[in-house]
């Protein structure tokens, strides 16, 4: 679906349908005056009186099929006092699903209406555009019985009554680019593990680099082992598929010596648990255990869509950004790591492996050490579908954030919340590390059942350089769902792509002495 812009008096607007937004209890005619100008029939449509404006309500109003705007979809926003950006997202998503159902070829939105909603005008436009795309996602690569693909409108257009406002146009482009990044993440995470292997992810990284001018580095399992990444090696020892350590870099001109913002994403393309084998029920969902790496791919697709190496700086991506992705399968095998084995990490610290199903932290700890040595990041953020305990604690809508300083934690929560990615901060209290102490090594890879998400974060903290700014995002809950939501038909959600995008665009303020 293409994004377009139309400029001129409302009488010149053309589309199969136009979306109109209305608050409950307010005069709909006043809220949709621009549309009444272009579609006078709307003012006298009897169905207009049936529309209440309740949150999530949609109503289709029909005019004459030969006129420029033959249909209006009314989108309810609920009470004005209760309005949030999430209200707008769900409203647009519901309307676009109705467009798919009715097979409406072209869709229009009056920008002035969006700009007049509560909140920042550019934010409203960006959220409306990204929300128009996300509910239309499909993954049908392996469907052979459907006679035709699900219908998708050919374009969506933003209507400007006067000159096109460059700020709002750029916001719309950000929304479009964010959707493209999320779609790539969803494709990778939804993809079956016999297709989406570590070597496949390397191919995808190189395609991004070739298309957008990024730089890619890759290490094979032999190189990873030779480098001394014993924790990472312990996970891939049982796998036939070759592991990879991938790094992809975006560096604006003149920023080559700048300390970068580094994201480290867990890329376990299939997780059986290893010798500590998972139950068979729902094991197929473990193809999603590379959601952290998938989000990094989505970020770089977004940067690429905004201009890539050559032009993204003019779109606001003025910081050097690097994504590091340790990628492997976790499989049981005669060569696989056993519970009770002791390995030496790249940092030199030794780890007693109590449970081979706590593998994500093992690949992340070596990748984090490597990233710090190679890139000396100003800020390092790791993200992973790391613990089931996080899902129990926070549910499917909220991710956990841990951070070494308040400014970093607050930035993740605020910037993520701005785009609908919700985070809740959990503590990094050293007292919890007692559960990770080992009698035979420097630490164990798991503690007891209690506080599992905190223990995992504290394990990773042992591999963060003194004074390094670091945040850990446990996205186990919101990264993958087995039920439909307004913005995601099924499976991978693309959670955290827009959080990373926000951090790359706006950076992280310095800590205030905490």
UniProtKB/Swiss-Prot annotation:
Belongs to the peptidase M17 family. The lineage of its organism: Bacteria, Pseudomonadati, Thermodesulfobacteriota, Desulfovibrionia, Desulfovibrionales. This is Probable cytosol aminopeptidase. Its EC number is 3.4.11.1, 3.4.11.10. Keywords: Aminopeptidase, Cytoplasm, Hydrolase, Manganese, Metal-binding, Protease. Pfam families: Peptidase_M17, Peptidase_M17_N. Gene3D superfamilies: Leucine Aminopeptidase, subunit E, domain 1, Zn peptidases. It comes from Oleidesulfovibrio alaskensis (strain ATCC BAA-1058 / DSM 17464 / G20). Its cofactor is Mn(2+). HAMAP family: Cytosol_peptidase_M17.
């Amino acid at each position: 679906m293409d994004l377009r812009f139309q400029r001129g008096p409302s009488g010149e607007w053309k589309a199969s349908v136009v979306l109109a937004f209305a608050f409950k209890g307010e005069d709909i005619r006043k809220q949709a005056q621009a549309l009444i100008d272009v579609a006078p029939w709307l003012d006298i449509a009897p169905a207009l009186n049936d529309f209440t404006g309740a949150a999530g309500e949609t109503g289709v109003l029909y005019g004459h099929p030969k006129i420029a705007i033959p249909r209006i979809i009314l989108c309810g926003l609920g009470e004005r006092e209760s309005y949030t950006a999430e209200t707008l997202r769900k409203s647009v998503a519901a309307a676009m699903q109705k467009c798919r159902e009715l097979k409406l070829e072209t869709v229009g939105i009056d920008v002035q209406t969006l700009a007049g909603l509560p909140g920042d005008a550019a934010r409203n436009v960006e959220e409306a555009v990204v929300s128009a795309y996300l509910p239309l996602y499909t993954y049908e690569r392996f469907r052979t019985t459907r006679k035709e693909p699900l219908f998708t409108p050919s374009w969506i257009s933003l209507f400007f009554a006067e000159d096109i406002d460059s700020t709002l146009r750029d916001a719309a482009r950000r929304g479009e680019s964010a959707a493209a990044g999320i779609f790539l993440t969803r494709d990778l995470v939804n993809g079956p593990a016999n297709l989406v292997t570590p070597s496949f992810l390397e191919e995808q990284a190189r395609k991004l680099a070739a298309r957008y001018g990024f730089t890619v580095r890759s290490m094979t399992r032999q190189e990873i082992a030779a480098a001394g990444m014993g924790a990472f090696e312990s996970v891939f020892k049982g796998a036939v598929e070759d592991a990879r350590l991938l790094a992809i870099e975006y560096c604006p001109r003149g920023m080559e010596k700048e300390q970068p913002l580094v994201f480290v994403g867990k890329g376990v393309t299939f997780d059986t648990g290893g010798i500590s084998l998972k139950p068979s029920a729902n094991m197929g969902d473990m193809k999603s255990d590379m959601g952290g790496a998938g989000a990094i791919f989505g970020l770089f697709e977004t940067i690429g869509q905004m201009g890539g190496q050559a032009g993204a700086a003019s779109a606001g991506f003025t910081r050097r950004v690097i994504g590091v992705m340790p990628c492997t399968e976790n499989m049981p095998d005669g060569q696989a790591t056993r519970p009770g084995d002791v390995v030496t990490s790249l940092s030199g610290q030794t780890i007693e492996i109590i449970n081979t199903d706590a593998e994500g932290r093992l690949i992340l700890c070596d990748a984090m050490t490597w990233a710090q040595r190679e890139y000396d990041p100003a800020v390092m953020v790791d993200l992973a579908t790391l613990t089931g305990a996080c899902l129990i604690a926070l549910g499917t809508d909220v991710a956990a954030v841990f951070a070494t300083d308040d400014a970093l934690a607050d930035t993740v929560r605020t910037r993520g919340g701005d785009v609908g990615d919700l985070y809740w901060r959990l503590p990094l209290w050293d007292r919890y590390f007692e559960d990770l102490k080992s009698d035979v090594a420097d630490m164990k890879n798991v503690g007891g059942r209690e506080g599992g998400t905190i223990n995992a974060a504290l394990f990773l903290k042992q591999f963060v350089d003194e004074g390094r700014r670091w945040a850990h995002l446990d996205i186990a809950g919101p990264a993958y769902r087995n039920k439909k939501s307004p913005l995601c038909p099924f499976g991978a959600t693309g959670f955290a792509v827009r959080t990373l995008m926000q951090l790359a665009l706006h950076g992280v303020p310095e800590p205030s002495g905490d």
